[in-house]
């Protein structure tokens, strides 16, 4: 059951990343996270 939850979270995270990637602020957010 725990594995399925992790898979679901991974899918959601991938969707969020794709949405952020289309926005101009994505590069700014990535730079902030890398620092």
From Swiss-Prot:
<dbReference type="GO" id="GO:0005576">
    <property type="term" value="C:extracellular region"/>
</dbReference>
<dbReference type="GO" id="GO:0090729">
    <property type="term" value="F:toxin activity"/>
</dbReference>
<feature type="modified residue" description="Glutamine amide">
    <location>
        <position position="35"/>
    </location>
</feature>
<keyword id="KW-0964">Secreted</keyword>
<protein>
    <recommendedName>
        <fullName>Cupiennin-2b</fullName>
    </recommendedName>
</protein>
<keyword id="KW-0800">Toxin</keyword>
<comment type="similarity">
    <text>Belongs to the cationic peptide 04 (cupiennin) family. 02 subfamily.</text>
</comment>
<keyword id="KW-0027">Amidation</keyword>
């Amino acid at each position: 059951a725990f594995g399925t939850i992790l898979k679901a979270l991974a899918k959601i995270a991938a969707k969020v990343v794709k949405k952020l990637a289309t926005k101009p602020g994505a590069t700014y957010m990535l730079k902030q996270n890398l620092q």
